[in-house]
Each structure stands twice: as structure tokens, then as C-alpha cells.
Regions:
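Collagenous Gly-X-Y triple-helix signature in extracellular proteins
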Residues: 51-290
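Extracellular "spike/adhesin" assembly and maturation modules
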Residues: 1-47
């Protein structure tokens, strides 16, 4: 089979075919070549303006469904080589996970940021990476702790010690072991007396932290909102002090459903608010706590 000749040229006009146009392949081929030439021209112009890499691709929100275009391995190859060649903020793909908590469910993985943590940490992150945020909450609710305490800070919570590791294992399987561990500065102690930076009479605040191996984590307030709102002290932020580009470009992305495609649902954040509450993002977008 012969290939059509493709010339990078933008064609602004194309001869229309009529009922009297001979139905010969040459008539079709010449028009297809014009269309292919347009595509190539536009691609060439885009390549001139856009250099592959985290900086430029972080600046563009696309929101494209990659599920039936690339495999997980192909997506991760574009991440690990640092080009992010056909990956942009808001692009997403679906995976299926199975856990002892929620059984089988679909997770829509949204690209929220690229190379966010490069050179961060007490051990610097050296690998190219993409931050993935699920579009929706997992379908089964979970507590931060069994009682209304924040003892041990974020790291000491039941969410971190028991719940998140179960989902991390399931997601690691679904993502073909491509999730990388990074070091994150997370709260591990809370003073039960003294005013919280949350204000409004909240008592108790995070008063220590430690570098911790992290595979799966709740977001900080800054990663979601771009600023602290109810965080009890500077210990609640650590190195997680940059808003993900997903929420900068598309603030509506902070609203999540319960389970894949479910109705609106609030979700936990990592910040301690007081001796008895952690921060959350409400189903109505409100910065709140429980």
C-alpha cells in the first residue's frame, strides 16, 4: 500500500467535490494530503512554541481522557523520561483496584502536577514524576481516628497507619509498581493546650514533625487551596507548600464525589486544626474541619 505524501503546509482552501467529480482515488488522496499537511503544520508550530518538560506542561490544562489511548506503562514512560510528551494537567485515566475496605472500584487518576517534589526532601527526589489525585473519593468512608483526637499528628492517625497503606498497595498494583516513595515532612505531635492558628477559639496545635517515607498521602491545605486556612501551625505544611497546578487552572476540580462518578462528598486533608479535629474540604467546597 502506497503512503500519502505529507508536506507541512497550512492549506486555507480545498476544492469541493461535487456529484460530477470523478470518483477516482486521486481525488480523495489529494484532499487527504491537504488535511494531513494541515495537521503536520500545526504540530510543527506547536513544537516550536512548546518545549517538552515539566515547566511548560504544568502551564497547560487539557483534561484529556488517556484511558483508551495509552497503557499505564506508556503513560509512566512519558513521565520517567522527563518529557511528559503527551501529558498535561487535568489529563486522566481509569484503573480498577480491589481492597479489603471497599472491594472492587474504579479510580479516575488525574494528573495534578509534574515534577513537584524534584530536589525536595532530606533525601532529594531525583526521579521525574507526576502527582496523581483521584477525581473522586474512594467509595467507602474512613475516619482519621476512632475518636475525636489528633494525638500523634497526621503521622500518628489511624488514616495513615491503617487505611492509606491498604489503598497504597492496591494502587501500586493497578499502576504496575510505578508509584515512587518520597520523603515528606509530616506532623507527629500535637500540643493539647495553646491556641491554634485556625483561630476562632480552637485549642491545640501541631508542634513537631519528621521526614517520613510517603507513598500515598492526603493533601495539605496549600496543595489544594494555595494557602493555609485552618492549619494549626507551620508544622502542618512542611515541604508541601505549593498548590498543585490542577487546582490553580481548574478550581472546580476540588469538588469530589463519593466513589467513581458519585454525588458530592467531603474529604480529609492532612492538616491538624486543633487537639480534636483535622481539616477537610466540604462537599460544597467549604474549608472545614471534623
Amino acid at each position: 500500500m502506497a503512503n500519502l505524501a505529507v508536506t507541512s503546509q497550512f492549506n486555507t482552501a480545498m476544492e469541493a467535490m461535487t456529484t460530477k467529480t470523478p470518483g477516482h482515488c486521486d481525488q480523495w488522496n489529494s484532499r487527504h494530503e491537504q488535511l494531513l499537511g494541515n495537521d503536520q503544520y500545526l504540530k510543527d508550530q506547536m513544537d516550536k512554541m512548546l518545549v517538552n518538560g515539566a515547566g511548560s506542561h504544568n502551564a497547560i490544562y487539557r483534561g484529556k481522557n488517556l484511558t483508551n489511548i495509552y497503557t499505564v506503562d506508556q503513560i509512566c514512560a512519558m513521565i520517567s523520561d522527563g518529557t511528559f510528551s503527551d501529558l498535561f494537567i487535568g489529563d486522566y485515566f481509569d484503573v480498577s483496584i480491589n481492597t479489603s475496605i471497599g472491594g472492587t472500584e474504579t479510580v479516575r487518576c488525574v494528573i495534578a502536577d509534574l515534577d513537584t517534589f524534584v530536589l525536595n526532601g532530606d533525601t532529594a527526589v531525583s526521579k521525574h514524576h507526576a502527582v496523581i489525585v483521584p477525581k473522586d473519593c474512594f467509595k467507602t468512608t474512613a475516619k482519621m481516628n476512632d475518636t475525636n483526637v489528633t494525638t500523634g499528628g497526621y503521622v500518628g492517625s489511624k488514616m495513615v497507619t491503617t487505611t492509606l497503606p491498604i489503598y497504597a498497595t492496591a494502587l501500586q498494583t493497578a499502576l504496575k509498581n510505578h508509584i515512587i516513595t518520597h520523603r515528606s515532612l509530616l506532623t507527629n505531635s500535637v500540643a493539647t493546650t495553646g491556641n491554634s492558628n485556625a483561630g476562632a477559639g480552637h485549642v491545640g496545635y501541631s508542634n513537631n514533625w519528621a521526614w517520613t517515607d510517603t507513598l500515598l498521602s492526603l493533601m495539605s491545605e496549600i496543595q489544594l487551596y494555595g494557602s493555609t486556612v485552618l492549619s494549626s501551625s507551620f508544622f502542618d505544611t512542611g515541604e508541601r507548600n505549593t498548590q498543585f497546578n490542577l487546582f490553580r487552572h481548574n478550581p472546580a476540580a476540588k469538588i469530589a464525589g463519593q466513589g467513581h462518578g458519585g454525588g458530592r462528598m467531603w474529604y480529609w486533608l492532612s492538616a491538624v486544626v486543633s487537639a480534636s479535629a483535622f481539616a477537610n474540604c466540604g462537599d460544597d467546597g467549604l474549608s472545614s474541619h471534623k
